[in-house]
Amino acid sequence: MIRLTAAAILLASAAPVWAETHTITPGEGAQERLQEALILAEPGDEIVLEAGRYTLTDGLSLDVDGVTVRGAGMDGTVLDFTAQEGSGEGLLVTSDNVTLRDFALENPKGDGIKSKGADNIVYYRIRVTWTNGPDPTNGAYGIYPVESTGVLVDGAKVTGASDAGIYVGQSDQITVRNSIAEANVAGIEIENSRNALVEHNIATRNTGGILVFDLPGLPVMGGGNVIVANNLVVANDTANFAPPGNIVAGVRRGTGIMVMANDGVLIENNIIDENPTAPIMVIAYTQPWEDERYQPFPLNVVVGDNIYGRGGDDPQLDGGEMLVAAFGGSLPPVMWDGLGSLYAIAGTPGWSLNLTEPGTAETAARPAPLDVPAPEGEFDRSGIGAPAELDDRIR
């Protein structure tokens, strides 16, 4: 029995040796060779994409647990979907414990990389770019994990998404860090998700920099427990180019950080500059809804110590010019609609619309300087962020 147990231990410890490396090179037949590797891979395998440009005409998919797809760098390995037929994602992942790292996608007809129901997924140094710049015909999302527990996005860069560059939806235990979101409608969006940490990112030249939303009518609602900290949110002044009907089509040009209908959000230690509508905006959901489960108010939102530069000087709001004149040339950095519950450290410059119910028109506002209580005690950070073991895959 002792010998059998020892043998079993040795066999188990040797299991990783069985993992295979599938190396793919650019050139003729790359589409078929790469998709075949994604289909035939076994758990623990690594698919290596050598440096070069891969001309692809169809989307790719991965449905095997525990696979790593590794390129030669976000500027070294480029999956070029300019000639893609159809309108699907560049890459769809529907399996757990997947690591995607060090490669780029350009010009997918639909989303860049979508992972659905893919728990413990890592996006590391991934780039998604629509090379024609802001355009409503671009794909909606660059990096798009949804319905997942355990999401790490680290060192990514997304440019040109017609909805959100980095979007995490209906998920739990999330970290988005060290990433750049530029010239998208929404730079980074956390939607209907809990326990998210958004830190050390750059959000610039988007319509809105960082959005934390909760929307009705989705399978997962009740977003909250989110920290937005240590980010550079600057010059988010791109005209909104979302297709009509998208929820982000209502985001005002010049929004820095926006919280809508979440419960428990901390905004601290960010540098927020040159966002002409509002450096920080905290509001209730503005549209009609029928879902009885839905809670539309921003609750327990805490604005901590942030660095505010220029902003609020060209607000895309009804009566914006009169508001600017009334406040002496620019609106204070923190804008609250007056609904729900907001806390801010002493001395936080801000203003309130003093609305009385969700969906009230801005013309019914009674603008006044911000008058909210200071936060009571420390923000509860427990359980926020991706599981620590996801970091081990990128070390």
Task: Please provide the spans of the model-predicted regions.
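Cleavable N-terminal signal peptides
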Residues: 6-7, 17
